Structure formats: structure tokens, C-alpha cells
Amino acid sequence: GLFDIIKKVASVVGLASP
């Protein structure tokens, strides 16, 4: 769902900017 995409993006951003 859309929320899953948001979580995935948030995870990528979190890894990129810890």
C-alpha cells in the first residue's frame, strides 16, 4: 500500500542521512 512505500522511502532516507 501507499504507507508501505512511505516506510520504504523513510528507511532509505534514514540510511542516507543517519
UniProtKB/Swiss-Prot annotation:
<keyword id="KW-0878">Amphibian defense peptide</keyword>
<dbReference type="Pfam" id="PF08256">
    <property type="entry name" value="Antimicrobial20"/>
</dbReference>
<keyword id="KW-0964">Secreted</keyword>
<dbReference type="GO" id="GO:0005576">
    <property type="term" value="C:extracellular region"/>
</dbReference>
<dbReference type="GO" id="GO:0006952">
    <property type="term" value="P:defense response"/>
</dbReference>
<dbReference type="InterPro" id="IPR013157">
    <property type="entry name" value="Aurein_antimicrobial_peptide"/>
</dbReference>
<protein>
    <recommendedName>
        <fullName>Citropin-1.2.4</fullName>
    </recommendedName>
</protein>
